[in-house]
Amino acid sequence: MASAGSGRAADATPGGRVLAILLLAYIFNFIDRQIIGILAVPIKAELELSDTQLSLMGGIAFALFYSGLAIPIAWLADRKSRVNIIAASVALWSAFTAACGLAQSFWQLFLARMGVGIGEAGGVAPSYALVSDFFPKERRAKALALFSLGIPIGSALGVFFGGWIASNLDWRSAFVIVGLAGLPAALLVKVGIREPVRGGYDTADGAASEPAPPFGQVAARLAATPSFWLLSFGAASGSILGYGLIFWLPSFFRRSFDLELTQIGAFYGSIVLVGGVLGTFLGGWIGDRVGPANPAGYALIPAVCFTIAAPCFALGLFAPSLAIAWVLFTIGQMLALAWLGPVIAAVQHIVPPNMRATASASFLFINNLIGIGFGIFFLGFMSDTMGPRYGDDSLRYSILYGLGFYLLSAAIYFVASTRLKRDWYAGERLAVSG
């Protein structure tokens, strides 16, 4: 991998090609991360697990190492080749996903899921920083939103193919097949992307930004940036329910609507795909139009969207038919993912380019440790707790109570909108001076 010289990022690799390659890797990231949601149905039956055990396997097992290793790996990515780190991460998480298919017990599957988390820890934050070095600030929210399409596309494909393979073969084969399918993406990242200049679109003359500072300096910068913490905890609050839904809704459709795995894969996969793609793209598109002139808009977009998403999901839980449920859940999914482009773009902008990977990892640490680690567990634990009262409908009420986290997220983003403008221009001054 050749190192970048001087000049703009466009001198290294065309931005569109880079975005396409990283999007492919991110799709596999979420296929491997979320496939366990639909496979939880046959796994629960075969291994005789409770909802709480399923939530630990799907949440804590993944989140501990995924969140904990993200910051040191991102610190390394601010200094070394981000391309090499991303390629190695894709290969590692793909191999551990395949290893999930070899598990014969709860603890074996728990450990394999830990391995998936270790691999994915090095994929996202370096990718955010890499994308930001290929696109100027006025196009960055849309570019990051396009990259973030990997979330709904990967989640939908994981649900669809996971359900189809498990129905026609078994759940172990589903893990092995999708895991091995991701390995070529690692090679494509390695050979298809050339490392760009860091901060070439953010410095006054297009030259590289200053070398990455010590971690203590990054921490001090983040500590002095209130909007970073508000954006992070706003995302984390929304992700408590977001990750909980992607894991538990397949089981909800099985228990409350009596759908088969292939039906769940098609039904819920289409909700995630249509709603997620529309919401992610439109959120970034709107962010690029309102954000540069008024940075508060980057926080107001998710504030409004989460406020509306909560009642959409609540109505969908009690819809009288699958068709009405599909419409309500799709609208809710669209609104719930609109935050990705605007918020990620704002996080990239409020710190200098040489701090981006570490700042992104810190943001992801908060978001994922709370969202994945607590959200999946919360809904599973609540479902077990309410099981004696509601029976197979316990997940319906568990999700209903969890919708309060969307409203909490909206409130945090409204507060963030009052602080973001000052931090936005402070980050701009630091980037230019670098």
Residue ranges and their predicted role:
Residues 5-11, 198-232, 256:
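Juxtamembrane intracellular "pre-TM" segments in multi-pass secondary transporters
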Residues 59-73, 270-283:
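Central cavity-lining transmembrane alpha-helices of secondary-active solute carriers
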Residues 147-195:
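Helix-loop-helix hairpin linking two adjacent transmembrane segments in secondary transporters
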Residues 112-152:
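Cytoplasmic helix-loop-helix junction between adjacent transmembrane helices
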Residues 48, 81, 102-108, 136, ...:
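Helix-breaking motifs and short loop linkers at transmembrane-helix boundaries and internal kinks
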Residues 68-104:
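Conserved MFS/SLC helix-loop-helix module at the cytosolic interface between two early adjacent transmembrane helices
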Residues 36-37, 225-281, 336-340, 344, ...:
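Extracytoplasmic gate region of multi-pass secondary transporters
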Residues 39-68:
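Extracellular/periplasmic helix-loop-helix junction of adjacent transmembrane segments
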